[in-house]
Amino acid sequence: MSIGRVVVLTGPSGVGKGTLLKAILSQHPEAFLSISATTRSPRPGEVDGQHYYFLSREEFQTKIAEQEFLEWAEFAGNLYGTPRSPVIEQVNLGRTVILEIELEGARQVRKTLPSARQVMLLPPSVEELERRIRERATEDEAAIARRLLQAQTEIGAAKEFDRCVINDQLDTAITALEAAIFS
């Protein structure tokens, strides 16, 4: 049995990571999407253990101390991390493991797993990104401003990634992301 591959997928909030990943995973059930842990509150419809592992800050910090995360970072006032053991288990089973994580987490993974493929998902424009974030209607103006500021940093880091995919037309973006992950 061959060893699997880790693929890191990063992109600004609102760029469409969830939509594209849903399409990719429906076409590639052999791939494994790592479920991240977070201290943020669940959004409507999100289920613990399916979308994220929702933890208190104290629980999260205990897991950091016990080195249970492959990577972790603070983003928009919340902690996010990738539980280590499921990733290692799935890679050892020969599966492609996708980590949907923030920029700082991607940088940590580059240090700990230099063979991981790093893919940045980009918006067609900052204006379109802002429209998508506002369309969610889940955040106040201050949170939107923070996300847009962070997006500038993330877009500026695109050169650090092995592949970049622009999410403009959905079908084209799905095809490009599929190639970035599996080829």
From Swiss-Prot:
Protein name: Guanylate kinase
Subcellular location: Cytoplasm
Substrates-to-products reaction catalysed: GMP + ATP = GDP + ADP; dZMP + ATP = dZDP + ADP
Pathway(s) the chain acts in: Purine metabolism
Pfam families: Guanylate_kin
The gene coding this protein: gmk
SMART domains given in the database record: GuKc
Matching PANTHER family: GUANYLATE KINASE, GUANYLATE KINASE-RELATED
Source lineage: Bacteria, Bacillati, Cyanobacteriota, Cyanophyceae, Synechococcales
